[in-house]
């Protein structure tokens, strides 16, 4: 069981208690902590849509500390980030690996950050298949299609060619925050809060 802190605020009508994530959401801050899966993606997508409905002209701050996870779950967040009007400020705290790195790079250009000791890792998609040989072939083709899609998007986000992305993601490719700036995954290393 994970522990979720609560904060208490004084209002004109007394005290109000929030879990920390609800309180952060009030300030347009969304947290991705842990593995990317359908349940996490649904929660993040709902928060993005809620914040756009509240104010489509204000930035949304998306903090990422994730080892990655399910590609299609990550793509649902990516598509929503691009679908809504507000700029998405991405900030890596801890690590952004695999789909976490993809989401980090998918923030609004000029507003993609990492803290000084954050680690970013990119690599090719992985997956497994079982069943009849034709089913395995279908799954392999789907993984290849997803790989090509991710490489094209990462190329656009980093300014690299899709061929270069394919080469650089052949194996796990770890970077410091500074190296991620040089690679084009993020725009700046943050040393002080800007909110």
Curated annotation (Swiss-Prot):
Its main location: cytoplasm. The active site is at residues 98, 123. CDD domains: S14_ClpP_2. It is found in: Cytoplasm. One of its GO terms (cellular component) is endopeptidase Clp complex. It comes from the Bacteria. It catalyses: Hydrolysis of proteins to small peptides in the presence of ATP and magnesium. alpha-casein is the usual test substrate. In the absence of ATP, only oligopeptides shorter than five residues are hydrolyzed (such as succinyl-Leu-Tyr-|-NHMec, and Leu-Tyr-Leu-|-Tyr-Trp, in which cleavage of the -Tyr-|-Leu- and -Tyr-|-Trp bonds also occurs). Fourteen ClpP subunits assemble into 2 heptameric rings which stack back to back to give a disk-like structure with a central cavity, resembling the structure of eukaryotic proteasomes. Belongs to the peptidase S14 family. Keywords: Cytoplasm, Hydrolase, Protease, Serine protease. One of its GO terms (biological process) is protein quality control for misfolded or incompletely synthesized proteins. This is ATP-dependent Clp protease proteolytic subunit. GO terms for molecular function: ATP-dependent peptidase activity; ATPase binding; serine-type endopeptidase activity. The lineage of its organism: Bacteria, Pseudomonadati, Campylobacterota, Epsilonproteobacteria, Campylobacterales. Gene3D superfamilies: 2-enoyl-CoA Hydratase, Chain A, domain 1. The gene is clpP. Signal peptide: none annotated. Its EC number is 3.4.21.92. Cleaves peptides in various proteins in a process that requires ATP hydrolysis. Has a chymotrypsin-like activity. Plays a major role in the degradation of misfolded proteins.
